[in-house]
Amino acid sequence: MLFPSIIAGLKHRGIRMAKKEKIEFPKIEWRDFSPAPIIGVDEVGRGCLAGPVYAAAVIFKSDALNDLVTDSKLLSEKRREELADLILKEHIVGIGSASVEEIDEINILNASLLAMKRAVEKLGVKSGHVLVDGNKKIPNLKGFEQSTIVKGDLRVAPISAASIVAKVTRDRLMKDLGVKYPHYGFEIHKGYSTPVHKQSIVDHGPCIAHRRSFAGVKEYV
């Protein structure tokens, strides 16, 4: 790390510090994939200490929301709720999940892929091209072509739509768990590893909604 005095000296001598380059992820024309239908898939909740992992799969029936959706993490809660309702109304959506018990049994990566598989199966279609956010294809998904797209939730509208639906659906569940287990604040942090959440585990121990294989939880089982 350069001290401020050194940086100031370099600037005085006309030496410019290189700026950290921002990596751009261009939009992808998802309609160019085949065969139809094109299915966007994403999951939410992988990094949480509590609650299931959720996934959604979306087939666009029109371009009505193509330019409105983006990664769910970049939207306000109110806007996510509005868009999720529109997506569910206007498009074909499948929602899947993997339980806390499944996460602890098969690990979070495999549970996330299982949730995505279940979401695709809920669509009621037997073939198509699945665009998966990330770099892992969905195992044992028969009858479908698959492509993985890094940062797909920013680059592919159906994946963005899936991320929105998955997050809103999971957030609603975590709010319900917050009522059922009031010591943990699930309705606020949605199960993520915040200082308040971690301290509540120290103070009260894990509840049935916690992932007992995760660091930050297993130490208090």
Curated annotation (Swiss-Prot):
Instruction: Give the domain of life.
Output: Bacteria
Residues annotated as binding a divalent metal cation are 42-43, 133
Q: What class of enzyme is it?
A: hydrolase
- Cofactor(s) annotated in UniProt: Mn(2+); Mg(2+)
Q: Where is the RNase H type-2 domain?
A: 36-221
Q: Which GO terms describe its cellular component?
A: cytoplasm; ribonuclease H2 complex
Q: Where in the cell is it found?
A: Cytoplasm
What residues form the membrane-spanning segments?
none
Q: What is its main location?
A: cytoplasm
MF terms from GO for this chain are: manganese ion binding; RNA binding; RNA-DNA hybrid ribonuclease activity
Co-factor note (free text):
Manganese or magnesium. Binds 1 divalent metal ion per monomer in the absence of substrate. May bind a second metal ion after substrate binding.
Catalyzed reaction equations: Endonucleolytic cleavage to 5'-phosphomonoester
InterPro entries in the record, alphabetically? RNase_HII (IPR022898), RNase_HII/HIII (IPR001352), RNase_HII/HIII_dom (IPR024567), RNaseH-like_sf (IPR012337), RNaseH_sf (IPR036397)
Record-level GO BP terms: DNA replication, removal of RNA primer; mismatch repair
UniProt keywords, alphabetically: Cytoplasm, Endonuclease, Hydrolase, Manganese, Metal-binding, Nuclease
What this chain does, per the entry, is described as: Endonuclease that specifically degrades the RNA of RNA-DNA hybrids.
What the entry lists under HAMAP family is as follows: RNase_HII_B (MF_00052_B)
This chain's protein is named Ribonuclease HII
Q: Which organism is it from?
A: Bdellovibrio bacteriovorus (strain ATCC 15356 / DSM 50701 / NCIMB 9529 / HD100)
Q: Which gene encodes it?
A: rnhB
